[in-house]
């Protein structure tokens, strides 16, 4: 499965309860962008970045959910997966709303990536991925609600599941392996 539908619904509810104008897709994209740019998986740094994005410190339940989101992303990168899981609405959601969420995910990713300090310049391939994401962020509402529109959406979503891995390989901080037990 390429999306986390129940997680998306849960985050939507938490964000709506707190009257926050950020979508779950944008929040997840922001986290992945930070991680791929080299911010690593530090819990405190992520909570601080999320608080800035949300416009203030999150409540206890949202803070716990943000921690869980970080754990989900960490798992994607530590399991050696060939694609990441995107936090997007389920396939039953109208295409226009799913396309809007995909654009929000890209906007969040670009913001998270851009706000993270990194050394050196990017390869042409990495720059192309970021340009693709910027273009995808602009397509909101432009896909037809048809079989062709669904196919286009799925192709773009699959591309976005793989593209972050290229950026992570180039800029990301590798996960530190768990310490090996010592024998005494």
Curated annotation (Swiss-Prot):
SUPFAM superfamilies the record matches: YgfB-like
TM annotation in the entry: none
Coiled coil regions in record: none
InterPro entries membership: YgfB-like (IPR011978), YgfB-like_sf (IPR036255)
Pfam families, per the entry: UPF0149
GO cellular component terms listed in the entry, alphabetical order: cytosol
Family indicated by similarity: Belongs to the UPF0149 family.
Protein name: UPF0149 protein PSPA7_5968
């Amino acid at each position: 499965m390429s999306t986390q539908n129940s997680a998306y619904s849960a985050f939507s509810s938490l964000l709506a309860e707190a009257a926050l104008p950020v979508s779950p897709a944008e929040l997840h994209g922001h986290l992945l962008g930070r991680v791929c740019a080299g911010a690593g998986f530090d819990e405190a740094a992520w909570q601080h970045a999320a608080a800035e994005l949300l416009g203030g410190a999150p409540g206890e339940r949202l803070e716990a959910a943000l921690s869980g989101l970080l754990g989900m992303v960490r798992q994607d990168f530590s399991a050696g997966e060939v694609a990441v899981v995107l936090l997007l609405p389920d396939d039953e959601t109208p295409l226009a709303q799913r396309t809007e969420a995909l654009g929000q995910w890209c906007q969040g990713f670009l913001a998270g990536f851009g706000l993270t300090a990194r050394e050196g310049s990017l390869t042409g391939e990495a720059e192309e991925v970021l340009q693709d994401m910027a273009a995808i962020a602009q397509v909101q509402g432009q896909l037809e609600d048809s079989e062709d529109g669904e196919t286009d959406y799925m192709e773009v979503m699959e591309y976005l599941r793989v593209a972050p891995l290229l950026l992570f390989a180039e800029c990301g901080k590798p996960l530190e392996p768990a310490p090996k037990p010592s024998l005494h």
